[in-house]
Structure formats: C-alpha cells, structure tokens
Amino acid sequence: MKQIYLDNGATSFPKAPGVGQAMKDYIEKVGVNVNRSSYRATAEAALSTLTVREDLCRLFGAGEDPSYAIFTSGVTMSLNMIMKGALHPGDHLIISGMEHNAVARPATQLEAAGVAVSIAPCDEDGVLRLEEFEKLFTPKTRLAVMQYASNVSGTIQPMGEIGAICRRHGVLLAVDSAQAAGHFAFDMQKLQINALCFTGHKGLLGPSGIGGFVMNEEMNKALTPLIAGGTGSMSASLEMPPTLPDRYEAGTPNLPGIMGLGVALRYLQEVGLDALHRREMALTERFLSGLRGNEHIRIPGPADSKGRVGVISVDFLRQDNAEVAFQLEEQYGILTRCGLHCAPLAHKTLGTYPEGTVRFSIGYTTTEEEVDAAIRAIHDLA
C-alpha cells in the first residue's frame, strides 16, 4: 500500500532536492567551524553561512543587513529568546487565542515571573478580533506576539493591520511564522514586524534543528541575550559581544543544518513562492470542496482556501478522532496528525477542545490523486 504523507504541518517531507546531500557533503568533506579558526576552509564556511543569512533577509523582506538574521535551533528557541529577552517584571505582553505552545508556554512562564499577559480573542474561524486586540494595549505593553498562520485551522492573521496597531501604540511585534514561511510571500518591513521567528523544517523545506529569527534594530535594542557563551569574537571579554549576529549566537552553530537550509532557500527562489502558493491553494480548495456537504464532519477555520494555508483539520462528529487517524494509516496509508497539535488555546477558540482534530496538511509534492484519496477515506470513515 502506497503511503500518502499529509503531515507537512508537523514537518515537510520530502525535503527540497539537494538538502540531504548538502548536509552530507559538509559533514564528510568540510567539517570545520566558523569564527573559531583562520584557515581557508573556515573562511569559506563563514561565507556560505553569510549567503544563507542574505537569502533569509531577501525572502522575508528584512532589509539588506544580513547580520540581523540570527540562527537558532528553530522557531521555539527563537520565540523564547525574543519574549524572555525583551520582557521584564511589570511589563505587559499580548498574545492571541490561537497561539501554539511555543508562544503560550513562554508566556505562562513570564506571567509567573511578573509579566502581565493578555490573550486577545479571535472569532470562530480563528481570526484575531482587531478592535478587541487594540483595547488591550496599556502604557506598560512592550510586546505583542502573534502567529501568522494557524497550525490547527490554517487561518491566516491580518498581519498588516496587526503591525499597524502595534506601531500606533509604540509596541514591538514578533511573529511566529512556522506555518507561513515558505507558503506565501510577505515583506516584514511593509507589515511592520520587528522580529520574524522561523523554522527550517516546515514550509522552508529544510532540515530539522535549524531556524532562527530576523529582526530590525528596534528589536535588537530591546533584547538581552538569553544564552551566553563562546562566539569566537571578542574572547577577552566576559560579556556577550555587542556585534551582530554574535550577540545572540553563543556556542557552536548547526552548520550542517545551515548548509541544508541554504539549499532549500535556493530551491524556493528558483521555483518561486507564488507558484508554490498557487498550487497549494488549488489543492486546498479541492480538498475543502470535496468534503462540503458531509454532515458527519466539521472543518474549523475559513470555509474556502481564501484566508488560510494548506492546513485542514477535520473533527469527526460520530467517531473518535484518534481511531480515525489510526484507520487512515492502517486502511488507506494516509499519514496525518491527531490531537491538540500543541495548541490548546487554538482548539478552545475553535470549539474542538479537548478532543482535538485530525489534521491534514498539504505539501509541495502533494498530488491531486492524493487529495482525492484522502477525501474518499474521510467519507468512508465519517
């Protein structure tokens, strides 16, 4: 039985062509570190790393200074570095009712440490209620953290309006782009985003364990480094260096991951985000259209492909969702993710808590035939 992979919201598979080979080549043929030695191979590795930073800035519309592109292990580490580096007891943080635990759990820790936290409400489709969001701002509000697209319903937030509201109140905006980066084009400067947190292993089609954040100088001035250690620069000082990106990159970087991510970014540039987005939206609309009229399921989020990414959650009203997910693999070879998707706030907003949903997430290699097979299986099992 052929497997149909529809769990790209968890991690993309397959990766962009050449990602694995680039990582293998680095490990087996290069293997050096950066900023730690002065021989030619390290200089070449540093140049390759710089190129990936430049590609990230270009992809996200972050300006021309690649030193503001910071590498971390992924979006979770990035969000922790932003939130815990920018906020102090007495400050006020705003998040939304659709956030992943990568935002909600750091927010809970910060609240226990004396930071006031507000959760902005969203409508039944998961879209932020902008008027109610703006009413939450106080003179002590320092940071708003919002996901761009939901990992449960695929809902895309109105980031332009969110950015404008934050700017109007002089509040920094950090964005969780885990389900947005690589799926559609956007410009963080035009959207007035101060820090964009990303992960390499989802829509960017890169490896696990590599991600980061791209920020502007406003965010840099507000941050205290969360992690301290060796950088290979200013080694005589016991303080973290003020220069970027070293200030936020203590320890040995994940160079195989960076090389793999670089290949993935070049693939996205060659194919074009607009082309990938059109294809994903066509498949998403096909999926949603094929399920309309089935009274035994509920699909939270926007009713059509407009306003969402290719993440489709299905709540089976007559069946146990976990059992359905098991049967999808056993009977049909369809791989999905069932449960709360590390996003209990989102499921509470969407009315699918505590049971959760069965999530189908489309990837860049998903075919019409695979979507049709999933539709038939859902109707069979509902």
Q: Could you describe each region identified by the protein language model?
A:
Residues 1-382:
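Pyridoxal 5′-phosphate
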